[in-house]
């Protein structure tokens, strides 16, 4: 016999860079749809517990990442970066500092372990 479950309410979270739609967040996994407005960026941050993969549905986004806290040193970019387009994905392991900057309006999916607000350690504020 097939198990069924009730649908969950999708949580809408406005952000300075766009918004998140939380499709699911439970003890097993988390799935979100993220929308970034062109020219906007999230904070430079990391997670001690969360492991996440981003999949770009549409648009173009630059991901900055590094194991160190500094993204810039004396105005010079010291973090690594990659530009992702539709169909690309990027894995953010626990502890990896990261930030996303939308080159175009961008829609992406986040697949991760469970999300806890207390597990976001912001180093530099975003939009």
Question: What is each stretch, according to the model?
Answer:
Residues 43-45, 63-64, 90-92, 97-103, ...:
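Short beta-strand His + acidic residue motifs that chelate non-heme Fe in jelly-roll/DSBH
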Residues 3-4, 8-9, 13-14, 69-73, ...:
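Double-stranded beta-helix
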